[in-house]
Amino acid sequence: MARVKFGKVTRRRRKKILKLAKGYFGAKSKLFRVANQAVMKSLMYAYIGRKLRKRDFRKLWITRINAAARAHGISYSRFINGLKKAGIEINRKMLSEMAINDEKAFAELVNIAKQQLNA
């Protein structure tokens, strides 16, 4: 009986991993075992990065809103509280965009928030 080194399935699996490892330095792009470890690690980092990206963008939006709100004489937390009391449900991404691109509309929202806090 002839010796079988590895069949179609194994070859395809190894080629798939080596294709994913393309561009890695040295043995990480050439040798299957090392490449497999590098690919697994990179996929793990990619998964974690997708979660972190959401947090990072939310932090960025809050920082931008806070800066714009303080320019109008109100803190971020009081601004958000005033909007909630006024029943205005605009997400932080949109508030951030308004703070940067539409200063008049953002100023109007700040005034509404201030009125709700004083009432």
Curated annotation (Swiss-Prot):
GO terms for molecular function: rRNA binding; structural constituent of ribosome. It holds the Pfam family Ribosomal_L20. The keyword Signal does not apply. The keyword rRNA-binding applies. SUPFAM superfamilies: Ribosomal protein L20 (SSF74731). Keywords: Ribonucleoprotein, Ribosomal protein, RNA-binding, rRNA-binding. One of its GO terms (cellular component) is ribosome. InterPro entries: Ribosomal_bL20, RIBOSOMAL_L20_CS, Ribosomal_protein_bL20_C. GO terms for biological process: ribosomal large subunit assembly; translation. It comes from the Bacteria. HAMAP family: Ribosomal_bL20. Belongs to the bacterial ribosomal protein bL20 family. Binds directly to 23S ribosomal RNA and is necessary for the in vitro assembly process of the 50S ribosomal subunit. It is not involved in the protein synthesizing functions of that subunit. This is Large ribosomal subunit protein bL20.
